[in-house]
């Protein structure tokens, strides 16, 4: 197993590990490797430029809201996104697409900093514990990194911190949210409680830890992201649009609720914002490829619980070929 191999290779930085590799011809060779910290670049923010109809648009992909909790000054999602925005501005892009698809969340502080790159200043998210006062986390920096057109892409697996960022930019009418009908719908905060620090004079050994849900996130308009997630302004179907994947589909999820909204100033009056949304929706309705994706998504849903397999080989092949033809569409 690969996991077992990785466990043997990993070790303290600077030490050596020797890999004995067997070649195809049967001979072996010993390769020494000095252990060091490995940074997987695909796990960090990156950008590219898309050119269409003589226009240039920037695409920023962020797989997670990463941070070094021991030192916020080190590389983190917010600082990396800021660098990518600067690169795209130098390239003269006319708009930016922020891709948060499959981003399961991460550091809340990086969300607050990141949202501030697109607005002057103001509240980003509200946090409230059971019976406690709500806390408003705000961007206090009036500088703006990007004031041009902005789109945020999401899907059913955009969760937690991703939902906070998408919700804030949507509430300000700063960005158009495009993607699945709604995001994952995780609007809760968990904390790990060390039981050894709670019970004094413990004679039972290590008591372990307990993970508790202690707080809930709320949009600046007062609504929670729990269960309902963030509704896309423009719904773009995907193959798994009808598969049950969200928080609402889990066992015993906490209910959606709302609190009082906080004061904030809209980025846009709404006219151009709403016009762009309506035009995009109309184009999607008339697009045959989009309709084909939706049909395939419904077909995948119909097969979700299909666990019957024929023991007749010819019947099995026939069904398999029909499935392949459907997926090739």
Please annotate each region the language model reported.
Residues 32, 59, 123, 149, ...:
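Generic structural signal for residues positioned in beta-strands
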Residues 1-199:
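Cleft-lining beta-strand/loop regions that shape enzyme active-site pockets
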């Amino acid at each position: 197993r690969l996991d077992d191999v990785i466990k043997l290779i990993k070790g303290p930085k600077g030490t050596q590990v020797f890999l004995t590799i067997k070649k195809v011809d049967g001979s072996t060779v010993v390769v020494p490797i000095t252990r060091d910290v490995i940074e997987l670049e695909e796990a960090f923010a990156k950008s590219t430029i898309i050119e269409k109809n003589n226009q240039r648009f920037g695409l920023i992909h962020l797989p997670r809201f990463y941070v070094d909790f021991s030192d916020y000054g080190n590389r983190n999602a917010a600082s990396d996104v800021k660098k990518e925005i600067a690169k795209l501005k130098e390239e003269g892009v006319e708009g930016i697409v922020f891709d948060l698809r499959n981003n399961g969340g991460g550091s809340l502080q990086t969300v607050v900093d990141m949202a501030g790159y697109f607005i002057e200043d103001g509240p980003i998210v509200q946090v409230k514990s059971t019976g406690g006062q709500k806390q408003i986390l705000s961007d206090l920096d009036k500088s703006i990194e990007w004031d041009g057109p902005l789109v945020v892409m999401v899907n059913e697996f955009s969760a937690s911190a991703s939902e906070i960022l998408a919700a804030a930019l949507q509430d300000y009418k700063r960005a158009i949210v495009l993607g699945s009908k709604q995001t994952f719908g995780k609007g809760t905060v968990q904390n790990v409680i060390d039981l050894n620090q709670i019970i004094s004079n413990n004679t039972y050994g290590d008591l372990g830890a307990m993970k508790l849900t202690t707080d809930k996130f709320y949009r600046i308009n007062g609504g929670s992201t729990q269960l309902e997630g963030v509704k896309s302004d423009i719904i773009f179907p995907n193959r798994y649009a009808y598969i049950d994947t969200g928080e609402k589909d889990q066992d015993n999820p906490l209910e959606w609720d709302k609190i009082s909204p906080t004061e904030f100033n809209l980025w846009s009056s709404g006219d151009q914002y709403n016009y762009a949304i309506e035009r995009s929706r109309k184009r999607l309705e008339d697009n045959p490829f989009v309709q084909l994706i939706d049909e395939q998504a419904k077909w995948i849903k119909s097969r979700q619980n299909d666990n019957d397999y024929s023991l007749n080989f010819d019947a099995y092949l026939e069904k398999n070929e029909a499935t392949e033809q459907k997926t090739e569409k």
